[in-house]
Amino acid sequence: MSEIAKWLNTRFQLTLIPKENSNTEFVGPCIFREDGDNTKLFGFRTTLFYTYIGMQTCLLSE
């Protein structure tokens, strides 16, 4: 587990799961909202030196 993943896990109690077919991108848990705008809490890429933390759209299959 990377240092940023450890920090996020400690601070926000998130378990970051590597996306399929990628060892550099991780996603947080889905947040399902009543308005249907389902988003990921965190998404970041190690190749960008952890500078990208943002929202990602959830798929219903997740």
Swiss-Prot record:
Main location: mitochondrion
Alphabetic keyword roster: Mitochondrion
Subcellular compartments: Mitochondrion
GO cellular component: mitochondrion
Record keyword Mitochondrion present: yes
Protein's recorded name: Uncharacterized mitochondrial protein ymf32
Lineage: Eukaryota, Viridiplantae, Streptophyta, Embryophyta, Marchantiophyta
